[in-house]
Regions:
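Short, low-complexity, disordered segments immediately C-terminal to signal peptides
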Residues: 21-50
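Post-signal-peptide N-terminal segment of Sec-exported extracytoplasmic proteins
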Residues: 42-69, 90-91
Length: 356
């Protein structure tokens, strides 16, 4: 009897141990996954720092808890936007039966990534975060008298992006949002990544903070939670201290569906130019763009558009890059080397900035 009891006891112990081992391995795998980090780079054009943030694992399961969304309105570039705002990550399911026609979808979707008309001045801060295996979140922040004047996000896709034509391309003004709008994935959310960018920017400026909880646009929140918000939080303490760089930008409406912005960044102590940016932006609707050949570039900019240079024949990006290089070398707002089509618009902004 004693021997029988020992054998039975050993058999039960083996069953218990065998039942425990898979759970232990799962827990170790979970701990290993949660300890992984993604690279984060930070700095202004004068200096670069490095930090790191944890990469949150995203799941897309039927039993994922649903977020309760609230309708929130905000204004940008003369348009009132209404988004389904949520806190936390959301995954927008699509069963291919949205019940929305392309015409109705085009009517309901609206985004505006171009800068607002006016002048912005203050201390300049910049940060970049690499997240989710190769995406890069970029943020510019301008602060004056302890008040946030500007928050501007962008995102660059990875080199191995599934759609080759968008690999390594920024999303805000390239036409990527148009690509999203034409994709069935947005049939239910009716928002693009640009909606999430501007929705966050509006909150941060209005509430004068970069950290803490923010709402995101339902259906486009993963980039915000994994990239944009970590990038903003990384600057939350830095913007409390004076920056070494000063930011000045002027944005004007040139008419006929075209606007432009000139940005000059200088070192405060020496007034040396560290960066010069110039871009021209097409209006948010084709109806506003008078030149029929340019209507296809609505909501894009000449500098960042994926297709503008090749299809228009105007090598705007190279011309501006050459101007930027010369301005930094000579430390002054130089004129374009040739009679570029955009020269007159650029010169008008230079005169107004230098006369201040």
């Amino acid at each position: 009897m004693k021997t029988k009891k020992i054998v039975v006891g050993l058999f039960c112990s083996m069953i218990i141990l065998m039942g425990c081992q898979p759970d232990q391995r799962t827990e170790k795998m979970k701990e290993s996954t949660e300890s992984e980090a993604v690279q984060v780079t930070s700095g202004t054009s004068a200096a670069t720092n490095a930090t790191s943030v944890k990469q949150e694992e995203q799941t897309n399961t039927n039993d994922q808890p649903k977020e309760s969304a609230a309708k929130v309105s905000y204004e940008r570039n003369g348009h009132t936007f209404e988004v389904d705002a949520v806190s936390g990550a959301t995954v927008e399911a699509n069963n291919g039966q949205s019940g929305i026609s392309p015409e109705e979808k085009a009517q309901k979707m609206y985004w505006s990534g171009r800068p607002e008309i006016g002048e912005v001045q203050g201390d300049y801060y910049h940060h970049e975060v690499v997240f989710d295996g190769g995406y890069t979140a970029l943020i510019d922040v301008v602060v004056k008298d302890q008040q946030i004047q500007l928050v501007e996000f962008d995102e660059r896709g990875p080199k191995n992006y599934y759609s080759e034509e968008w690999a390594g391309v920024t999303k805000r003004l390239s036409g990527y949002a148009n690509f999203q709008a034409n994709n069935a994935r947005t049939d239910q959310s009716l928002v693009t990544v640009v909606n999430t960018m501007t929705f966050l920017e509006n909150q941060m400026v209005a509430e004068n903070r970069l950290d803490g909880a923010f709402q995101t646009a339902k259906g486009q929140s993963n980039s915000a939670n994994n990239g944009y918000l970590p990038a903003a939080r990384a600057l939350a303490k830095e913007i409390k201290e004076p920056s070494k760089e000063h930011y000045t930008s002027l944005t004007e409406d040139f008419g006929e569906g075209l606007s432009g912005r000139l940005t000059v960044i200088t070192l405060k102590d020496s007034r040396k130019i560290t960066d010069l940016r110039y871009d021209e932006y097409f209006a948010d609707t084709e109806e506003e763009i008078k030149d029929a050949k340019l209507k296809a570039y609505s909501r894009q900019s000449k500098y960042f558009s994926k297709d503008y240079a090749q299809k228009s024949g105007e090598n705007f990006k190279k011309e501006v890059d050459d101007l930027r290089k010369k301005a930094i070398e000579e430390n002054k707002l130089v004129s374009p080397t040739n009679e570029e089509a955009w020269s007159e618009n650029y010169q008008s902004l230079v005169k107004k900035i230098t006369s201040q």
